[in-house]
């Protein structure tokens, strides 16, 4: 999707062997044909990267078994009652659990409530892998910050929050992302802290948009230009 494909291309451009996986066969076939439905990478760069040999794309689960570092970037929509739909995360955890081996790392990027990655994903991965958490494999969380359609603030240009289940995994995960993220990374003190930071980012943006929308409607009824108000208010330093 719009998170996974630019990330896969970015790592491949740095010489990393990347296997992009999606359960949606038509989507993978489109990418292999040089089509980028997300418009985040573009046909020219996608084709060039695929021809470069470092990036392969597949819908065949067995082909990702050889990987040792898994980054999961699945959506987290909401249900009709506005509760989070965690089925994509559950499904991805099952997929990872079926293919990981001892010594592997699993990093989730999906936007979730604090605690979900550890509460939900660990038991599922352990169940399907038969491997013991921390002893056999390590977990991390690094919230995606991509702004769809933004060609300035991209995966490579936005500082990345990273977290791990222990000091060793945090260091490993940080070094992986530092290979491609130009501004570097911020090492969060825990997975829950990283999850909470992402929730705050999204909430702050939504609150600001809603607040300004309300003000704009009020100002419009008063015959006041909202942009003029913002220009005036923006002269204060905070």
Model-predicted segments: where are they?
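Structural/interface elements that position substrates and couple domains in central-metabolism enzymes
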Residues: 1-238
